Swiss-Prot record:
Designated name of the protein: Acyl-CoA-binding domain-containing protein 6
Domain ACB: 42-127
Positions of post-translational Phosphoserine modification: 41, 106
Organism: Rattus norvegicus (Rat)
Subunit structure, interactors included: Monomer.
Region (Disordered): 1-34
GO MF annotations, alphabetized: fatty-acyl-CoA binding; lipid binding
Annotated InterPro entries: Acyl-CoA-binding_protein, Acyl-CoA-binding_sf, Ankyrin_rpt, Ankyrin_rpt-contain_sf, FERM/acyl-CoA-bd_prot_sf
Gene: Acbd6
Residues the entry annotates as binding an acyl-CoA: 69-73, 95, 114
Length: 282
């Protein structure tokens, strides 16, 4: 695999530590072009920006982190080269879509956009000042931004919405919000997912019960036609599948791909329960 940021034709020697242009002259002057120097300077500034982001995760929004994540991947990996995550992997889908949207964007452009975004996040950032390295100074593959996005990010309390509280299984907050009519129990996010979808995806059985008691639409479908039953089945939460069925969930509803809930699970026990229930309704 070509070494990033080296001019065309440059390779690493057998020792891995010396550059070779393909001849035995050992003359490196050809590499000292203005273009090569500019690329090297940009790469160094990019690495400093990536290190600085480690301290900005708490103040950056989800959208800003995704923006940075996509450009980091474009620089380090290149064009998006992995399959789209499964429908129930919300976080993975968002990251994949952000990266995929960059298309054939060059590493140079991605680095410039990344650096500009960091400067916008922290106008007072001085690249000449070395970053302090703590226990998190080395974050492994992907760098600071990628690492933070591969885990549930910490969201400031004032920035949380009802779906964040649902993800956290904060039953008390959600119950109060619904009863005070601050939120509609059937409100959906940008993907058409209702609170019930989220609760089923995360395996929060008690929250599912609360939402059903608050008259959540049990057969509500998201933008891909999937119901809460699809989510519970796909995530193999058999107890939630049974709870939904007992509460009137329809196992005959298909998603946009034509799949029944029993067809999106890898668990034979869950699939069998759904098949038997569907047969009983026939």
């Amino acid at each position: 695999m070509a070494t990033p940021f080296l001019p065309a034709g440059a390779t690493t020697g057998d020792s891995g530590g010396e550059l070779s242009s393909g001849d035995d002259s050992g003359d490196l002057e050809s590499f000292q072009t203005p273009e090569a120097e500019a690329t090297r300077s940009l790469a160094e500034l990019f690495e400093k920006a990536a290190a600085h982001v480690q301290g900005l995760v708490q103040v950056a929004s989800r959208e800003q982190l995704l923006y940075l994540y996509a450009r980091y991947k474009q620089v380090k990996v290149g064009n998006c080269n992995i399959p789209k995550p499964n429908f129930f992997d919300f976080e993975g889908k968002q990251k994949w879509e952000a990266w995929k949207a960059l298309g054939d964007s060059s590493p140079s452009q991605a680095m410039q956009e990344y650096i500009a975004a960091v400067k916008k996040l922290d106008p007072g950032w001085n690249p000449q000042v070395s970053e302090k390295k703590g226990k998190e100074g080395s974050s492994g593959f992907g760098g600071p931004v990628v690492s933070s996005l591969y885990h549930e990010e910490t969201i400031r309390e004032e920035d949380k919405n009802i779906f964040d509280y649902c993800r956290e299984n904060n039953i008390d907050h959600i119950t109060k919000a619904i009863k005070s009519k601050t939120v509609d129990v059937n409100m959906t996010d940008e993907e058409g997912r209702a609170l019930l979808h989220w609760a089923c995806d995360r395996g929060h059985k008690e929250l599912v019960k609360v939402l059903l008691q608050c008259e959540a639409g049990i057969n509500c479908q998201d933008n891909e036609g999937q119901t809460a039953l699809h989510y519970a089945a796909a995530c193999e939460f058999s107890d939630i599948v049974e709870l939904l069925l007992q509460s009137g969930a329809d196992p005959t509803l298909r998603d946009q791909d034509g799949c029944l809930p029993e067809e999106v699970t890898g668990c034979k026990a869950v699939s069998l329960v759904l098949q038997l229930h569907r047969a009983g309704k026939a």
